[in-house]
Amino acid sequence: SRRQRQMCIRDSFYGGKVKYMVNDLLMNLHGLAPLCIPINKTGKQAKDFPRMVEAGFASDNQLIMFPAGLCSRRQNGVIRDLDWKKTFIVKSVEAHRDVVPIHFEGRNSNFFYNLANLCKILGIKFNIAMLYLADEMLKNRHKTFTITIGKPIPWQTFDKSKSPAGWAQYVKDIVYKL
């Protein structure tokens, strides 16, 4: 079955110990729950965000995260990530964990990108587009995506020669060249 193939693919990498740090709204897709570490960045539980990230890095799971903290956005007709946050650099050094650059080539619907842009124009701070993430995932069922995995970057690379934000940009540049 499709689910068995997905689990087989996941289990072939790092013995199945791969987790995605995702917005907790995606936990409503029950098939994703075992693969994810839910992150709540809004509301009353937002104060737990640092603890949730810390727990993910302290685990023995390999973590896949989205360093921009949001899905890519379409700006001037180009779909790109927003600025990457430095969290993954700081935590990689603290936890002595290497960073493996991964480029996932995919896209959301025009509705999603237009909604995100409309909210930005209207000055709406709440990320309304995230409410549609589960729907966007379902729209992409049965589609093929290209995932390119780069060479691991040792955590020791992230020294004081650049700021954590500078290193985040460095890794972003590597990912976009994959």
What are these regions (language model features)?
Residues R2-I9:
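Short, small-residue-biased leader/transition segments that mark boundaries at the very start
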Residues R3, M21-D24, F66-A68:
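Short His-Asn-centered micro-motif
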Residues R5, K17, L35, K143-F145, ...:
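A generic secondary-structure signal marking the coil-to-beta-strand transition
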Residues I9, K41, N76-G77:
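A generic structural signal for short
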Residues F13-Y14, A95:
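A broad structural signal for alpha-helix termini and local helix breaks/kinks
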Residues Y14-R51:
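Membrane-interfacial amphipathic helices and adjacent loop/beta segments
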Residues K47-L178:
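Non-catalytic C-terminal accessory region of glycerolipid acyltransferases
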